[in-house]
Curated annotation (Swiss-Prot):
An MF annotation (GO) of this entry: structural constituent of ribosome
Signal peptide from the UniProt entry: none
Lineage of the species this protein comes from: Bacteria, Pseudomonadati, Pseudomonadota, Betaproteobacteria, Burkholderiales
Species assigned in the record: Ralstonia nicotianae (strain ATCC BAA-1114 / GMI1000)
Entry keyword set: Ribonucleoprotein, Ribosomal protein
Name of the featured protein: Large ribosomal subunit protein bL34
InterPro entries: Ribosomal_bL34 (IPR000271), Ribosomal_bL34_CS (IPR020939)
UniProt keyword Phosphoprotein, yes or no: no
GO biological process: translation
Length: 44
């Protein structure tokens, strides 16, 4: 059986990247929550 996680940098950036997070209100909320928490990395 094939493993479920098949890494791809392109797909990773397109689905979880900073610019994608900035596009929607919910994504911006995620970034603000991570800023408030003091995360070192906001997005991948």
């Amino acid at each position: 059986m094939k493993r479920t996680y098949q890494p791809s940098v392109t797909r990773r950036k397109r689905t979880h990247g900073f610019r994608v997070r900035m596009k929607t209100r919910g994504g911006r909320a995620v970034l603000n929550a991570r800023r408030a928490k003091g995360r070192k990395r906001l997005a991948i």
